[in-house]
Amino acid sequence: KKSLIMKEKMIINYSPNFDLKKRKRKQIKFLIFHYTGMRSEKDAIKRLTNMQSEVASHYLIKNNGEIIILVPELYTAWHAGVSKWQKKRQLNKSSIGIEISNPGHKNGYKNFSKKQIKTLIKLSRYLIKKYKIKKNFILGHSDIAPDRKLDPGEKFPWEFLYKNKIGIWHNLS
């Protein structure tokens, strides 16, 4: 179905992996980016919607730029795991998680597609505006769980996102 907020096709494929208690909009402070880290997109969708996996994000951006809605935004998706940013711990409760289809470091890590990044920018802008997310609270999974996670990885276009008014970028030169 077409979204009212974006031109990209959005597919609903709900995951059972979220807290049943609704949260308040004002609790949402972070935007967390992930890669799926699975051999195929089909495998990623299967894992993110399987009750036994106990993992899901709010959104998945497919290779072709389509968005799959996995968990409604006002519910806590299980995407961050053991996590910390500054003094805040367990970021699932205060974040929106976006998975981007990519095999990741263990399965042939590749560049993210232009369609994925275009969709990510639109979705991120929408979420940033809706929840008033601060630039320094737009993070990668590796930022909040550095001892156990690598995603979204070194091929993730942080500088390009920054140029599109998403997140921060430190130019060291």
Which stretches of residues belong to each language-model region?
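Acidic, His- and aromatic-enriched active-site or binding-groove loops in soluble protein domains
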Residues: L60, E154-S173
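Acidic/histidine-rich, metal-coordinating catalytic segments
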Residues: I133-R148
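Alpha-helix boundary/interfacial micro-motifs
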Residues: S53, G81-V82, G153, W158-F160
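A charge-rich, low-complexity, intrinsically flexible signal that marks solvent-exposed coils, linkers
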Residues: W85-K88, K149-K155
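Short amphipathic alpha-helical patches
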Residues: L91-S94, D151, Y162
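Short, Lys/Arg-enriched N-terminal segments with co-localized hydrophobic residues
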Residues: K1-I5
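Active-site-adjacent loop/helix surface patches within enzyme catalytic domains
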Residues: K7-K132, N136
